Amino acid sequence: MAASGQKYYIENRVYYHDTDAGGVVYYASYLKHLEEGRTEFMRSRGIDVAEYAKGGTLFPVVHLEIDYKTPARYGDTIRVYTKPEKIGNASLEFSQEIRRGEDTILKARTVWACVNVAPGGSAAKTLLKPIRVPQEIRQRIGA
């Protein structure tokens, strides 16, 4: 089922701790920005992922693809765009872009699984069971 809606974005600054010895953003640092984009997208739709976690429903990233186009640098202001693409039975797929002005820094596709901590288990023990994406999330994302 395709999710409708426009791309949502947050604006972030690139800090020194994001960069590597070459003065550009270290590739793994982008993961933090992508996560913040997805989390804030959900929050903008009235969905608090942390509240779901308290009830035992988690949304781990199970797939991530990134195409790097051009580097961001210390001091840059970047926008992290997030758009829901598909809601499966037990998964959510997002397309994301990080841009600096008109320049595309990267394009990404991320898949979250929707899982519940099994009775007596914990996330640390990885006793996780796939569950259907809650109806509230389906409605608020627009699918």
Predicted features along the sequence, with ranges:
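Hot-dog-fold acyl-thioester-processing enzymes
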Residues: 2-61, 117-143
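HotDog/MaoC-like acyl-thioester-processing domains
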Residues: 8-10, 73-77, 85-143
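Hydrophobic beta-strand-centered segment that forms part of the acyl-chain substrate-binding groove
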Residues: 41-92, 107, 112-113
